[in-house]
């Protein structure tokens, strides 16, 4: 549910003045917007740290620390026996950031083409009444993403297979992308629903990272779990350039 931070950020941006007033009353002096953001972010970070304080490693990982096996060596992933699996794990996650980084984040560029509008004054007015602001599209997609993450975990338990659930999500992304770009036009609520569903079908991040790490031995699982998501996020640059 970490993605809900983006939802919280939307409400902070929308009601920033109100929150600034509350914080200013507490500390007795007026704050700039960036100072409010620092305080809110710092408090949330400390709360997250407290919630993680009770976590512990399994005995499997604890036993690995007492062996002489190399641990956390990133370059081990480039061995012939590992590189194909490692690249495949990265590719599986790229559609998530294609949806979030392109379809949702650049929705303000898609709406004129989706709605078949031009730059005329009349069409600009229509665009304002039918399109959804990008921050709100992000909010709805992240609510969907959090919901999808929960459902994908439950479905993987039900099917006893993460692979099947990931296949379902990838097919869902393909279908919803076509509906979003080439489907019928609708009202703002229709596009809010589309943003939510796009987020829901990309909600396999947790099982994607878990699946990636479990392809490798315990000595490099933490390295895989840390680097695969970062390469996927970095892939947004190539995706947007290619798009």
Region spans (language model):
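Extracytoplasmic gate region of multi-pass secondary transporters
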Residues: 82-148, 236-241
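Intracellular juxtamembrane helix-capping segments at the cytosolic ends
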Residues: 107, 203-216
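A late C-terminal transmembrane helix in Major Facilitator Superfamily
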Residues: 143, 213, 218-243
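Glycine-rich segments within core transmembrane alpha-helices of 12-TM secondary carriers
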Residues: 1-20, 44, 226-240
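Helix-to-loop junctions at the C-terminal end of transmembrane segments
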Residues: 148-161
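Symmetry-related core transmembrane helices of the 12-TM Major Facilitator Superfamily/SLC fold
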Residues: 32-51
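Structural signature of the two symmetry-related core transmembrane helices
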Residues: 164-179
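Flexible cytoplasmic inter-helical loops of multi-pass small-molecule transporters
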Residues: 53-74
């Amino acid at each position: 549910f970490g993605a809900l931070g983006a939802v919280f950020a939307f409400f902070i941006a929308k009601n920033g003045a109100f929150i600034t007033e509350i914080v200013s009353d507490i500390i007795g002096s007026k704050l700039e917007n960036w100072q409010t953001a620092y305080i809110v972010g710092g408090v949330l970070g400390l709360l997250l740290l407290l919630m993680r304080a009770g976590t512990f490693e399994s005995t499997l990982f604890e036993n690995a620390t007492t062996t002489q096996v190399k641990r956390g060596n990133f370059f081990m992933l480039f061995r012939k026996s590992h590189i194909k699996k490692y690249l495949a794990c990265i590719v599986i996650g790229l559609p998530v950031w294609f949806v979030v980084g392109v379809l949702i984040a650049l929705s303000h560029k898609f709406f004129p083409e989706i709605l078949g509008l031009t730059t005329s004054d009349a069409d600009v007015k229509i665009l304002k009444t039918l399109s959804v602001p990008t921050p709100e599209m992000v909010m709805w997609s992240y609510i969907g993403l959090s919901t999808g993450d929960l459902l994908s975990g439950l479905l993987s338990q039900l099917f006893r297979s993460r692979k099947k659930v990931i296949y379902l999500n990838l097919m869902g992304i393909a279908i919803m992308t076509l509906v979003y770009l080439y489907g019928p036009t609708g009202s703002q609520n229709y596009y809010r629903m589309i943003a939510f569903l796009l987020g829901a079908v990309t909600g396999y991040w947790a099982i994607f990272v878990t699946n990636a790490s479990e392809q490798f031995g315990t000595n490099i699982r933490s390295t895989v779990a840390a680097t695969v998501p970062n390469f996927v996020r970095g892939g947004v640059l190539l995706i947007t350039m290619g798009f």
